[in-house]
Design a protein with these regions (language model features):
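Conserved "landmark" site that anchors the functional core of diverse proteins
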Residues: 1-182
């Protein structure tokens, strides 16, 4: 079993996906990622069929692998590093897949020139959907965990890193706004 622990939750870190649009007629907010362009780009690097993403604002979370291994990718312009199990520290870049192993910790310091950043996990976070979506609406208390993340939250990921190939794409030009969510 693979598991991660949130060692620092960051600013308003929540679980999001592309949104729940089938319940708006009942007054349920669609929620979903604030910047869907970024999670669309992350899907190209880390196919995440459950569409579960960790969204954070300004100050990102720190995530430590408790057991096993996990393949992730961070989206958005962020300062981040990896504290390896042997206490060495590696700088890393967004839009590149990263293999983390037991004891490794991803530290996202902050976003740069943007509000939101995202983390994609290769096999999702092992969560159950709520109203056919993983998105969190903190005001309504709806979502897979129906609240922002807290320090010491643990997620169990069902599979090991499936391939050792590290994948990257050119940093997307997100300045071109074609459509956006209000």
């Amino acid at each position: 079993m693979n598991s991660i622990i949130i060692t620092r939750a960051g600013t308003h870190s929540t679980i999001q996906d592309f949104g729940r649009f089938q319940y708006q007629h009942l007054g349920v907010s669609p929620s979903g990622a604030m910047d869907q362009r970024i999670i669309t780009e992350l899907q190209k690097i880390i196919p995440n069929h459950q569409n579960q993403f960790l969204e954070f604002a300004y100050v990102g979370p720190s995530i430590k692998v408790k057991e096993g291994s996990v393949k992730i990718c961070v989206g958005g312009n962020c300062n981040m590093s990896i504290q390896k199990n042997n206490n060495s520290q590696l700088e890393c870049q967004p839009y590149k897949s990263i293999n983390l192993f037991a004891g490794d910790e991803l530290i996202i310091h902050n976003t740069i020139d943007s509000v939101y950043g995202y983390i994609a996990f290769e096999h999702g976070l092992g969560l159950e959907p709520c109203l056919n979506s993983y998105s969190t609406d903190t005001k309504a208390g709806i979502g897979s965990i129906n609240r922002p993340l807290n320090d010491e939250d643990i997620f169990h990921i069902s599979k090991d890193v499936s391939s050792w190939d590290l994948i990257s794409i050119p940093k997307p030009d997100l300045e071109k706004v074609t459509n956006f969510k209000v």
